[in-house]
Design a protein with these regions (language model features):
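Short, often N-terminal, low-complexity regions
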Residues: 13-14, 18-19
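Active-site acidic-Proline motif in GNAT/NAT acetyltransferases
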Residues: 126-128, 132, 160-161
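Conserved acetyl-CoA-binding loop of GNAT-fold acetyltransferases
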Residues: 16, 170-179
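Acetyl-CoA-dependent GNAT
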Residues: 27, 32-39, 43-49, 54-128, ...
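Conserved beta-strand-loop-alpha-helix junction that forms the acyl-donor binding cleft
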Residues: 156-166, 183-185
Length: 195
């Protein structure tokens, strides 16, 4: 392990946003505390799982179009799973909070599938906050921050046929770029260009 990788890991663990040079590429680490001006943002932990399960169970439409289920085990797995070739140091599983109340959950991968792209693996709103343009405001802040860190796009996958998700993401500037089969379920891979 090089001194750079251990130094990056240490800085990231304590929440610093720094720039590191690898050849000619500038890598700007994500500081999740800067993802929202309105809500406090923090990493979600195992002790938060019951709260996450409750919010997920209330979002019944989402689970009609995916193989995922809102269980403790699935959420714990989601907190740790990364795409092939991506380390846990590039994964951020966090919540947006209004005081003690969880407003939204997000799983964000830095540098997937390319270094200049951020990937939203999961985004779910607390139903109490839905229909009030809060989700759109959160996504707007996240996208703005990603642009400021040098990302050129944000990518995600929408479960094909899910009208709620399709409407939300297209309303927020994401365009389907291709379809992918994942375990027998069709996903619409969508992207929002930032440059």
């Amino acid at each position: 392990m090089s001194i750079f990788s251990s130094g990056v890991d240490i800085l990231e663990a304590v929440g610093f946003r720094e720039q590191f040079f690898y050849g000619r590429v500038v890598y700007t680490m994500i500081d999740i505390s800067k993802l929202s001006k309105r809500y406090s943002v923090r990493i979600l932990e195992e002790s938060d799982v019951e709260m996450l399960v409750e919010i997920c169970k209330q979002n019944t439409v989402f689970y009609e179009y995916t193989e995922a289920r809102p269980t403790r085990e699935n959420i714990l797995d989601d907190m740790k799973v990364t795409p092939p070739g991506i380390s846990m140091s590039d994964k951020y599983y966090f919540g947006f909070f209004d005081g003690q109340e969880l407003v939204a959950i997000m799983d964000l991968i830095d540098g997937y599938p390319k270094p200049e792209i951020a990937y939203i693996g999961f985004f779910m709103m607390n139903p109490t906050y839905q229909g009030k343009k809060i989700g759109t405001a959160i996504i707007g802040e996240v996208v703005e921050y990603m642009r400021d860190t040098g990302k050129t796009a944000v990518r995600l996958a929408i479960d094909k046929g899910n009208p709620q998700s399709t409407h939300f993401w297209t309303k927020n500037g994401f365009r389907v770029i291709f379809e992918a089969d994942v375990n027998g379920w069709t996903k619409l891979v969508a992207e929002r260009q930032l440059m």
